[in-house]
Amino acid sequence: MNSQITLFFFFFSILSLSQISNSSSLLKPHPCPILPLPSSQQLQWQLGSMAMFLHFGPNTFTDSEWGTGKANPSIFNPTHLNASQWVQIAKDSGFSRVILTAKHHDGFCLWPSEYTDYSVKSSQWRNGAGDVVAELASAAKEAGIGLGLYLSPWDRHEQCYGKTLEYNEFYLSQMTELLTKYGEIKEVWLDGAKGDGEKDMEYFFDTWFSLIHQLQPKAVIFSDAGPDVRWIGDEAGLAGSTCWSLFNRTNAKIGDTEPSYSQEGDGYGQDWVPAECDVSIRPGWFWHASESPKPAVQLLDIYYNSVGRNCLFLLNVPPNSSGLISEQDIKVLEEFSEMKNSIFSNNLARKAFVNSSSIRGDQSSQFGPKNVLEEGLDKYWAPEENQNEWVLYLEFKDLVSFNVLEIREPIHMGQRIASFHLETRKTGSGEWERVVSGTTVGNKRLLRFLNVVESRSLKLVVDKARTDPLISYLGLYMDKFSGSSRNTTKITITRTLKEEQQLHDL
């Protein structure tokens, strides 16, 4: 009997120890996301970073920007049109999708619409049997990049424009053609522009949105007010220094949204509506023989102020009257890509030992600070709950020189950070000195410094957040192109022999 009791307690003890061991190995759950959150298509759109706009149509041949809708269709004759060239240039330059003006304000359709004769079927191109949308859709699919389509609400050719029901039926029919004949569409672009003195027109936006989501559920819809993507409020490609993906759609109206609200978003917004920054590589949106492209360094500056401010960079690269992207533009895009890749291919922070003020769970947690050196949304640093400070520390064996800071949030968990700053230690005194400050982060925040910083000890401090901050990536880079690297500020700290040995052993 005693031996049975002893055996019972032995197995009970083993079972208890096993349960304790299993309990201690359980992972701390992920923190709760904070609303609003991006949809799957919004998330994919934001991670795409850059898209190429293609303004093309009769305006390309009439040397105009806003066509009257009266140009003879026969003028449209791009004899060397090659949509594969457009797509390959976009892909080689790092763009995730192309967006074509299938119909601009002049009403001319780049596909053979069954609802108007004012289209490619009335032109000389391909003897009236051509379809620009079809050729681009095929090229994009083959290259593996997304396709977006622009369908102007304002139509200067269509006679029923101004007749509310009749024109909305016309527009919805053309939209249906585009969304059912050309495969998967990633973005539908609705321009809020309309000239002064034009006919009054009520658009059935809610019906349009419902139809688009019904026919192309993976597409995002762009307009001044969303519902999925908003306009940044200018045509210079520049976002606000504070830029939330949060937005209140009830505070916005297509064609009449306060520019500052579009620029900054709304930290208290109830909707997730990230911003898109559109700008043309040339002075005009359509190709003009008399115009030249912006220099590559200017595109780099726009990249910092769009992608680097939590937005998508939509760069217009208009095909010329031959139907090709001009060599001038190609050269600029190649230079821009080389600059961008040269800067961001080498994250100097990867050389650092990273620590933090706290970790959600414990030191063996899946939310440790080393996660910020790995790209991707799945891993991130999360501090312990209810802390009064949120800090990441970076220590380097050797001096590191940089003039660009990158921070990313795992936006599938919501946008959280409202302000932050970077500090480095002074030589000799060891006191912390602020280098740069910023506000929102979101998908990606890039900050350039006036001076190059040389340091061994850094700390990133989150000053304010909507809830406990999460950081998915941290980068330090050297930009030798922007003109901000002429001055060097050497900021170092002497360490004890023990500290040096600890770093040496990493």
Swiss-Prot record:
Keyword Amino-acid biosynthesis: no
Signal peptide: 1-23
Record GO cellular component, one term: apoplast
GO biological process: carbohydrate metabolic process; glycoprotein catabolic process
InterPro entries: Galactose-bd-like_sf (IPR008979), Glyco_hydro_29 (IPR000933), Glycoside_hydrolase_SF (IPR017853)
Domain of life, per lineage: Eukaryota
Localisation per UniProt entry: Secreted, Extracellular space, Apoplast
Functional pH dependence: Optimum pH is 5. Activity decreases sharply toward pH 7.
Residues bearing carbohydrate: N22, N82, N248, N320, N355, N487
GO MF annotations in UniProt: alpha-L-fucosidase activity
Family: Belongs to the glycosyl hydrolase 29 family.
Official protein name in the record: Alpha-L-fucosidase 1
Organism: Arabidopsis thaliana (Mouse-ear cress)
Gene: FUC1
